[in-house]
């Protein structure tokens, strides 16, 4: 008996083709051929903790929207981050809250990076959340508030985070500013008004003599906060500045020494002048990019007590810098750095009260990718080399 249906020649041909395709697929699966797999667009980046809001909340989402590149971020102290790179942590982009920290740990006599770009400044500030500890803008002697034996001050540990040694530098500079009229920089800071200087000098000496220091001891302010109060458990050190707000909001500290940008981003109150600016003068807040003031910064160094020390580099303005790590370079790293140091990055940094440089400057420019060389200049001649190396 004949079957009720017989496939035509065309049908048999179709079946043969299908079987051939199946055979090829099985062959591919067996490993005889590997098709290219489309890689996701990702970038692994380290950044100083103080950039968590400007980058993590604002810049990175916009960068992802525009480029499709997903940015994996680690925020922490720049010094501890540099140690991670040295230990083999695979970051493509590294952003530091201190250009000298980046240079000394990742460029100088090392193989981790070969250039850096300085793109923003910042300022130190005195912050609080409890109005009980508010410092009135009309009150010029802020050092009394933070050095009382009964008040608790928090700062970052200088051995892990730049804001720690920058707080040390600020206190050392203030000590010189209020004690040494013979210093020509101090005279300039007071517009050569000796009677005004003497008002501050009298208040400084009267206060610190009560605490057991000699008259015109320029290190009294630094010593009281970072040695005496620390030993009395009324100065607390943390690993990174982004955790200082927790000390304030929990009541574990009355004041925190951190950046103006942190005060803005974390809704902290901070000491202001009568005109609404930073109450810590430019001569001590490390926010200057002025040759004369930066020379004043150089008179002190970053060294602290054994438990809060990173080295002895000269004082310098707070300068943020970025590089691409040599061994783990993502193809998207150059685009990220370019957008960070130009218009889009400048916009979001300014929103967080950083002070982005309208003209970023580079160190070892010839080692940079060509796209980045086009948007940087050499370091300005008025800046001491110690400010970025």
UniProtKB/Swiss-Prot annotation:
InterPro entries: ModA/WtpA. CDD domains: PBP2_ModA_WtpA. GO terms for biological process: molybdate ion transport. It comes from the Archaea. One of its GO terms (molecular function) is molybdate ion binding. Residues 1-29 form the signal peptide. Keywords: Signal. Belongs to the bacterial solute-binding protein 1 family. WtpA subfamily. This is Uncharacterized solute-binding protein TV0544.
């Amino acid at each position: 008996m004949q079957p009720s249906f017989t496939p035509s020649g065309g049908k048999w041909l179709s079946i043969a083709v299908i079987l051939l395709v199946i055979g090829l697929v099985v062959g591919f699966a067996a490993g005889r051929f590997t098709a290219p797999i489309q890689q996701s667009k990702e970038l692994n980046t380290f950044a100083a903790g103080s950039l968590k809001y400007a980058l993590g909340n604002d810049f990175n989402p916009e960068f992802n929207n525009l480029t499709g590149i997903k940015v994996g971020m680690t925020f922490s102290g720049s010094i501890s981050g540099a140690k991670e790179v040295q230990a083999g942590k695979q970051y493509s982009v590294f952003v530091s809250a201190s250009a000298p920290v980046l240079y000394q740990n990742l460029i100088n006599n090392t193989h981790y990076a070969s250039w850096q770009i300085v793109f923003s400044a910042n300022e130190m500030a005195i912050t609080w959340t409890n109005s009980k500890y508010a410092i009135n803008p009309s009150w010029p002697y802020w050092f009394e508030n933070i050095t009382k034996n009964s008040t608790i001050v928090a700062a970052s540990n200088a051995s892990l985070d730049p804001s720690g040694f920058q707080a040390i530098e600020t206190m050392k500079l203030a000590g010189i500013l209020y004690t040494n009229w013979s210093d020509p920089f101090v005279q300039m800071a007071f517009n050569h008004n000796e009677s005004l200087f003497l008002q501050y000098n009298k208040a400084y000496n009267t206060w610190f003599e009560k605490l057991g220091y000699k008259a015109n001891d320029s290190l009294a302010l630094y010593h009281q906060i970072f040695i005496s109060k620390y030993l009395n458990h009324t100065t607390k050190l943390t690993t990174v500045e982004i955790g200082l707000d927790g000390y304030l909001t929990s009541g574990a500290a009355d004041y925190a020494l951190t950046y103006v940008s942190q005060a803005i981003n974390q809704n902290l109150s901070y000491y202001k002048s009568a005109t609404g600016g930073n109450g810590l003068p430019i001569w001590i807040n490390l926010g200057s990019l002025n040759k004369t003031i930066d020379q004043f910064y150089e008179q002190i160094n970053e060294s602290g007590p054994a438990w809060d020390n990173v080295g002895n580099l000269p004082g310098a303005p707070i300068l943020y810098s970025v590089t691409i790590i040599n061994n783990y370079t993502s193809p998207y790293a150059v685009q990220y750095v370019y957008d960070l140091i130009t218009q889009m990055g400048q916009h979001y940094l300014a929103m967080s009260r950083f002070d982005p440089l309208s003209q970023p400057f580079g160190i070892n420019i010839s080692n940079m990718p060509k796209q980045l060389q086009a948007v940087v200049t050499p370091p300005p001649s008025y800046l001491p080399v110690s400010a970025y190396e």
